[in-house]
Amino acid sequence: MKVTLLGASGGIGQPLSLLLKLHLPAESDLSLYDVAPVTPGVAKDISHIPTSVEVEGFGGDDPSEALKGADIVLICAGVARKPGMTRADLFNVNAGIIQNLVEKVAQVCPQACVCIITNPVNSIIPIAAEVLKKAGVYDKRKLFGITTLDTIRSEKFIVQAKNIEINRNDISVIGGHSGVTILPLLSQIPHVEFTEQELKDLTHRIQNAGTEVVEAKAGAGSATLSMAYAAMRFVVSMARALNGEVITECAYIEGDGKFARFFAQPVRLGKNGVEEILPLGTLSAFEQQALEAMLPTLQTDIDNGVKFVTGE
């Protein structure tokens, strides 16, 4: 199993590299790439940690060497959010970066599962899809926007609010990965009930948790450490699924188009990527209303990504 991390030397990339070295399946290969010349040094640094994951690092303008033979490509390259910026403000900078990297993926390792955390995810995944499609190698089962940060925040905030233990698959977060498009299905969590006000307050906190971190860091960055943990958790699940385990995760994917062409939803992962899109179950009245209200925003985000590549 080979995992390639693109953007390995940044604020998310370095802690994520460390977490992957610690948690990827035994005997995995971890390839780190970043334009920053420090990247081989990051690889050398974590290579001294005694796990069976083998690490190598590559710097420079061309990620091709790092991508050779990759089963999973994880992309966190791009600029981070700053105070006052929305994820959409990041679009013009990060869109071009992702387009260039995904073009390289299409050339070097077209069969790889591509997992992206670069924001704005709602628009970046459509860009990646159109680039892969243009190259003739698009398999929608193998392209993922990682929304796991919304899931882990939901888990933590629910435990804080209700003082209960929940399992990681008890909570589905659907829709997209910014603001009102983030919709945790709190009503479906077993053995716990929420008042209407609790549902609204908790949903609002989950939707705005990224801003909470940006403001708390007072201009010095965004959610990097929790994002690194979330990305590690998803990629380890992906690696286990490719090795034959049946794994359930939420991710932003191109699905059946019921709500939008790209939509975050629970999926069953397997050897081919997405093996099955799982039903959403019954939504509460509040959740149904929130779902319907978010769709125009999500659609605009998707359209922006598609237009960036196709010009249409």
Swiss-Prot record:
Which GO biological-process labels does this protein carry?
malate metabolic process; tricarboxylic acid cycle
Q: Where does NAD(+) bind?
A: G7, A8, S9, G10, G11, I12, G13, D34, N94, I117, T118, N119, M227
Which sites are catalytic? H177
List keywords of the entry alphabetically. NAD, Oxidoreductase, Tricarboxylic acid cycle
What Enzyme Commission number(s) appear in the record?
1.1.1.37
- Which catalytic reaction applies to this protein? (S)-malate + NAD(+) = oxaloacetate + NADH + H(+)
Origin: domain of life = Bacteria
Residue numbers binding substrate: R81, R87, N119, R153
Enzyme group, top EC level?
A: oxidoreductase
User: Which NCBIfam families does the record match to this protein?
Assistant: MDH_euk_gproteo
| Its biological purpose | Catalyzes the reversible oxidation of malate to oxaloacetate.
Which HAMAP family does the record match to this protein? Malate_dehydrog_1
Q: Which family does it belong to?
A: Belongs to the LDH/MDH superfamily. MDH type 1 family.
Task: Identify this protein by name.
Answer: Malate dehydrogenase
